[in-house]
Structures are given as structure tokens and as C-alpha cells.
Amino acid sequence: MNDRMVWIDCEMTGLSLSDDALIEVAALVTDSELNILGEGVDIVIRPPERALETMPEVVREMHTASGLLAELDGGTTLADAEAQVLAYVREHVKEPGKAPLCGNSVGTDRGFLLRDMATLEGYLHYRIVDVSSIKELARRWYPRAYFNSPEKNGNHRALADIRESIAELRYYREAVFVPQPGPDSDTARAIAAKHVVSAG
């Protein structure tokens, strides 16, 4: 069984796949216990000038405050950034198509990866582990856990955001998931039988 989880966070000039540019990508790989493997990578990408010119003001302010905007002139190419991330991921995930993409609201990140880093995106499993989904369920089913979740210091830098996502999943695992080893097989089967949806 492949227990690896690939955590990726992207910073962009906006959220539009047709207009905006990927300007930072970071990755960490964990095992199933959420232990980080290796040092990870965090890479700044130099965007096309047009993407900077059309960047929404709120995004410009965010990337100025985080220091990312000042680093863009020294950024690398998309191809080089993809090669660096892929090298790190392959070091810890030997088989393509096995490890899911993980993070917070990773659907947007996956869209930019598919557009700009298709080889990397294709190396990942099609499934995702989205911590924001767990957070939304906790808000509805375990509000005390939701409202007491770890405070985020989010500076909107990719690697820091990943570390916070991993910490958040560790918290929800401890606060809302059934303690290990979970139910025995008979109990699990009995629970499953209550939730079978009939065909037709």
C-alpha cells in the first residue's frame, strides 16, 4: 500500500485559469501519519508581465505584504519549477498515480497544475485530500472542534500554507476522528449495513 500524501500549495496572481499566472509553488510529502519526509521545496516563478499588470489590487496587497511580489523578478521558469517539485516528489513517491494531492481548497491548485505543470499533475492520483472539506463537515457536525481549531498565521506563502494545512489535519484527526484502531470489523460491517443505498 502506498501511504504517501503529496501536499502542494500554489500562489497565483488571481484565480482565473484564463488570465492569471502561477507565481509560487511549494510541496511537502508526508506518510500516512502526517510525518513530513525530506525538506520539501518552495519555488518562486517569474510570471509574464501582463499577469502582473492585471493582478487584482487585493491580490497585489496580499503578495506585497507576504514579500512574494518583491521576489518575482528573481523567480525561475514554470518548467524549472515543475522539474524541481517533481524531483522532490519522485524521491518519496516511487510509483506514479498512487499518492493523492493534499491541501486546503486544492481544486484551484490542481487546475493551475494541470494547466502549467501537467507532468507533475499526472504523477499524482486523481483523488484529493482536501482539509477544507473536513473543516466544513466539522463546522456542521462538531462545531466545538471547528471553533477551537488551531489559529492560522497564514502569511500567504506556499510552504507556510502547506505546513498549516498539515497541522490542521493533525488537529482534526485527533479532535473529530474515531481513535485508532477504529471499530472492529463486525462493528464496521454493522454500521455499513445501516447506510447502504438501495439500487434504483
Curated annotation (Swiss-Prot):
Annotated Gene3D superfamilies: Ribonuclease H-like superfamily/Ribonuclease H
EC numbers: 3.1.15.-
Keyword Cytoplasm: yes
Highest taxon above the source species: Bacteria
Top-level EC class: hydrolase
GO molecular function: 3'-5'-RNA exonuclease activity; nucleic acid binding
Location of this chain's protein in the cell: Cytoplasm
Swiss-Prot/TrEMBL keywords: Cytoplasm, Exonuclease, Hydrolase, Nuclease
Positions of the catalytic residues: Y126
SMART domains on file: EXOIII (SM00479)
Family listed: Belongs to the oligoribonuclease family.
Functional note: 3'-to-5' exoribonuclease specific for small oligoribonucleotides.
Annotated protein name in UniProt: Oligoribonuclease
Organism of provenance: Streptomyces coelicolor (strain ATCC BAA-471 / A3(2) / M145)
Gene name in the database record: orn
